[in-house]
Amino acid sequence: YKRQPTHFSQFVPLLHEVFGDEWFTKGCISAHYQNMVVEGEEVQTMVEKAPDSSGMVAISAQKRDGTPVLTGTASLGPDYGETELDKRMAKLRPSSQLVILSDLTVGQKGTGNPESVRMDMDQHMGDMYPFSNKQKLEKITETHEFYEGETPWGGPVIPLEMISVLTQYTSGRSGFRSRGPAIGLFAGQQIKMIDGPLMIRKDYLLEREIIALSESRRTESNWILTRVLCADSKKVKAEVILNSATLKDSYANY
């Protein structure tokens, strides 16, 4: 099935229209995923035409038959407002008895911090995403002129959905261990540009931290914040929050 950040590319032209070039330098997209999408299913994305008084627009995506795919918010920094994931994290109940995620703690930092990463146009991005940015651009759901050639920032920009790939590229070094085998899925994601955009062929550092752990009747969830820093200046360029949920029923020892 499509890993949900695929849908983020469909929002970019709409959000560029609403927010202008600032979307690429300090835009924030925050989404809660509702239903899975498999290859070949059509997905329509929707964005409010103008920001509300807090500077925020609501975003959503649905399948052709109306099945909701995601709901969320988009906004500009430096204020950003209360994002979709901010709202959801504020409502989390602390969990006392995690099983699958029992080896994790809130505040835990990645053992590989800082992890060195970059994305070249032809670079294979690992086993989880076995393709290059160039291959992605040939098949991307919705392309943008800033992904190739010259841009206001010099060279090509890393596409919004590929920022997720960049931050997952070295995730094996984090030391964040869960018990398994069990079935996990992306439940939500937020990509916040602080001093963007992130560029192809630039060196970055990643710092990871677990910012929340939670559970529902069916799942255990972790919320991992990854900061993306410029390798030279050590300045924070972007922050990504990934909420991963693991199905309790899929773990044999539950």
Model regions and ranges:
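Hot-dog-fold acyl-thioester-processing enzymes
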Residues: 2-26, 81-188, 251-254
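Hydrophobic beta-strand-centered segment that forms part of the acyl-chain substrate-binding groove
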Residues: 6-49, 53-56, 161-211, 223, ...
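Generic detection of short hydrophobic beta-strand segments and adjacent strand-loop junctions
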Residues: 31, 74, 117-119, 191, ...
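HotDog/MaoC-like acyl-thioester-processing domains
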Residues: 38-109, 195-254
